[in-house]
Swiss-Prot record:
GO cellular component, one term: chloroplast
PANTHER family xrefs: MATURASE K (PTHR34811:SF1)
Biological process per Gene Ontology, one example term: tRNA processing
Name of this protein: Maturase K
GO molecular function ontology, one term from the record: RNA binding
Protein's cellular compartments: Plastid, Chloroplast
Keywords: Chloroplast, mRNA processing, Plastid, RNA-binding, tRNA processing
HAMAP family, sorted: MatK (MF_01390)
Pfam families: Intron_maturas2, MatK_N
Entry similarity comment: Belongs to the intron maturase 2 family. MatK subfamily.
Amino acid sequence: MAKFQGYLEFDGARQQSFLYPLFFREYIYVLAYDHGLNRLNRNRSIFLENSDYGKKYSSLIVKRLILRMYEQNRLIIPTKDLNQNPFLGHTNLVDYQMISILFAVIVEIPFSLRLGSSFEGKQLKKSYNLQSIHSIFPFLEDKLSHFNYVVDVLIPYPIHLEILVQTLRYRVKDPSSLHFFRFCLYEYCNWKNFDIKKKSILNPRFFLFLYNSHVCEYESIFFFLRKRSSHLRSTSYEVLFERILFYGKIQHFLKVFVNTFPAILGLLKDPFIHYVRYHGKCILATKDTPLLMNKWKYFFVNLWQCYFSVWFQSQKVNIKQLSKDNLEFLGYLSSLRLNPLVVRSQMLENAFLIDNVRIKLDSKIPISSIIGSLAKDKFCNVLGHPISKAAWTDSSDSDILNRFVRICRNISHYYSGSSKKKNLYRIKYILRLCCVKTLARKHKSTVRAFLKRLGSGLLEEFLTGEDQVLSLIFPRSYYASKRLYRVRIWYLDILYLNDLVNHE
């Protein structure tokens, strides 16, 4: 990013309208192609002159696209011509793929510059451990054990493209770029049902940016309600809702709501509340009664339906009591568990036994969904009985073994924070026996004969790093006892959900 900083310097008079000219600058395409900025992008091959030979950036493709962008009519292909010549649709698809990659990079520029200017003069401590998914669970263990109820919300996606355009309009003050963005989106959706589209999608980074912008707009309203409820009389909240309602779209409802807004916030005021969002879901934890939880529930429904014009069903907001219900979050089932403790206290000659009850957050593995995911991938049947992986029998023995070991260690690594390891051991047993059955099927032998020939050394490959570390730290007597059965380890290097968690 530093080597392109000179290109991004512009005077203050052009700050509001500098984005659109960048679409016609070749160096921005080089910036989009840069591997450091696109390490998560799988569509970089469209910038290559030949993806199988050379792996070089093609300036000719970029120049042709820029020439077509000067005349936007050349980017429009009528449906009649698309049916007669599908190759035109393929060419147009490549153009829009390149534009989506470029748009994701260009629109992020003002956001990054604004974020950098807000941190000037401030000393920020970098904590890479907070990037881990497992860093959320220690926070939940510390906070949720003191709360009673949780509101589990599935964040809806905007149905209409204009909602995304209007949301982006609040932050990008460049009309030309927004018009071009709207044009590309609608043109892309006009022919998305054709066969040329089935194996191609727009840039994932582009849609991730749009989704985050949409969620950021929703959270700005929520945090406004949460933080400004103590000084409503001095807050000009009419302007806020006028911006959200897309330029007076529901004027009558706006007047009614503004008049009753202080009373609504008074009902939602709660000093003890925590908010966590990840992977399209958010949870709201509080100590309050079910009555206030129902008010929050209908607040979310009205917020999405009235202010964002997104149809949102009340069934997507679940109110759960942690002492009775399980909270499904990031592949774990979490609930509060009462842990009784007996403390012996002695004062002089008198001794007392004091019964204490400590509330702990119990995180368990959703074994049913994991077995369903394993059955879908042909590791076992729907009952959890291991079967051979027939599709892998053409690979070498070492390749088959390495695949199973890698899957087993990834699962053990991700679910190391489970309070009870019984379900984890069952998953590892399924994978081990599936591996043995696959190897036995390849060599046309039985499982018993195959294990007798190789011995127990084959199963030692499945010993995870966690088991090796714990066996070195704790004594053998402790390692073999049931105490280690409840040891929970949260790793701070897990940045993505496990594939089995995303089985749905």
